[in-house]
């Protein structure tokens, strides 16, 4: 039904919709500011009341992604920006849009088509894993643009998403750029202390565990 609707509903020339599985943030938030600065109409599609509250606090237009309005906005948007998957916006109305996948990390480990968990079949049926891999690859082909932080990352993303060289462009990536062009050490420490209190001269350690191939994320260390 969604596919039929997107064939009939004309897409706007200047409407962009944004969404992220983790709320108002990620690379989509950085691109939001660029789009708005260039005069594009932008709407953030929310998945929870917390997201809606965050959008309201930021003073930006928003709509629930699972609502009729969320469907309509996604179906009308010329550009759809996501960070995880089509479910970041209204998944039933993305067909035909210029889909920008910003992703949400650096592929230090295997992901997508390169990770066994992607096509892990819930039942031991012959050919099911292959069918799941095919379905995943077909879904990813809707992506029109996927920015990469470097040429090394570009190659890994091409393999993981099954996309050609023309779809993945080395432009830099907001989540990564901040590490090289972000605040100084003293500024970063000040931000930490504003959250946790004074750390005096203590050494600070960043604990950033990677994705566990579909398993539960590791807990915060206690020692």
Residue ranges of each PLM-predicted region?
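N-terminal pre-catalytic "stem/leader" segment of glycosyltransferase-like enzymes
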Residues: 1-69
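Active-site-proximal region of nucleotide-activated glycan assembly enzymes
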Residues: 94-182
């Amino acid at each position: 039904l969604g596919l039929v609707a997107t064939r009939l509903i004309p897409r706007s020339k200047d409407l962009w919709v944004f969404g992220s599985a983790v709320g108002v943030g990620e690379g989509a938030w950085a691109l939001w500011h660029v789009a708005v600065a260039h005069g594009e109409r932008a709407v953030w599609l929310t998945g929870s009341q917390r997201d809606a509250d965050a959008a309201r606090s930021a003073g930006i237009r928003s709509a629930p992604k699972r609502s009729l309005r969320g469907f309509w906005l996604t179906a009308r948007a010329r550009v759809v920006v996501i960070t995880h998957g089509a479910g970041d916006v209204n998944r039933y109305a993305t067909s035909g849009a210029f889909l920008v996948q910003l992703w949400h990390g650096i592929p230090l480990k295997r992901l997508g088509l390169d990770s066994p968990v992607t096509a892990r079949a819930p039942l031991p049926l012959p050919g099911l894993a292959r069918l799941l891999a095919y379905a995943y690859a077909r879904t990813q082909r809707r992506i029109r643009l996927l920015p990469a932080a470097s040429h090394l990352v570009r190659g890994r993303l091409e393999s993981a998403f099954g996309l050609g060289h023309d779809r993945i462009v080395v432009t830099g990536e907001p989540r990564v750029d901040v590490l090289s062009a972000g605040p100084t050490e003293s500024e970063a420490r000040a931000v930490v202390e504003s959250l946790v209190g004074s750390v005096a001269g203590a050494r600070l350690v960043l604990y950033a565990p990677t994705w566990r191939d579909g398993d539960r994320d590791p807990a915060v260390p206690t020692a």
